[in-house]
Amino acid sequence: MILSVSRRTDIPAFYSDWFFKQLEQGFVLVPNPIAHEKIAKVALEPLKIENVETNLLGEKKVEISGNIEGIVFWTKNPKPMLNKLNKLKDFKYYFLYTLNAYPKEIEVNLPPLDERIESFKILSKYCPVIWRYDPILVTEGIDENWHIEKFEYLTKALKGYSKHCKISFLIESYKGCDKNLHKPSIWQKDKILSAISKIAKKNGFQIEACAENGYSKYGILPSKCIDGEIFEKLLTEKYKDLNIQVKRKNNKLDGQRKNCLCMPSVDIGQYDTCFHDCKYCYA
């Protein structure tokens, strides 16, 4: 099982102490996001290889314990969790770090940009960090040229600390989206994608689209944020002589967008508990 921490709120930013208490007790109780009276108990035991036996034909029989194949953290501010990451030594994990350069009027309660960039660099010493530049939106004072300028600044700042950047465009229909924020027009999208794909390549980043397709002409391919292949790579690094595969299912979870390629996961967050107060909230 892949644990999602969390699409619904920013646990690293606001609830890191709570999260590690759940790890210590070995399980977490998760209310159903729709039917709150329904509570799921989710075990939190890291996947471990307990024993490997090899028969006369050279075939390996592997005994595995634990249920968590990996953890995906979603955050805009991992700083409160940075001094606790040693507690994750038995788990495989990576971070999806949303890092934009929007003004305080849009991303109200985030730390200063330079501080968030520094946190990104520190975090990258512990685990893979995937940069999310999303959602891309336009409003008064923020147009396609603004995005190109800010993206270049961020790309240069993060060069060498990550290799992947996931993008998506604003979804205006989300209930948390301010009516003054808009999705770029077709020609604005074309200009943005043309420019940032070149900037990314120059600085060692591969841009990938989250739940969107049709950008292959820019060298931008669809991708999955919750990616079993990343965990297979991490597990293979630890157990080099074993071919470990993360369990995959093709079925989508409720709420996943049409073009979302994420593998199923269990999310342990709760809606309406994030205090960033972003004016485009997509939780």
Language-model regions, residue ranges each:
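A C-terminal junction/extension of Radical SAM enzymes
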Residues: 188-258
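Active-site beta-loop-alpha junctions enriched in small/polar residues
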Residues: 8-10, 76-78, 98-102, 134-138, ...
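Local cysteine-cluster metal-coordination motifs and their immediate loop/turn environment
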Residues: 258, 266-283
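Conserved Radical SAM active-site core
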Residues: 1-107, 113, 117-122, 283
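Surface-exposed cleft-lining segments at the edges of enzyme active sites
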Residues: 102-111, 134-145, 177-185
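Conserved C-terminal portion of the radical SAM core fold
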Residues: 115-176, 195-211
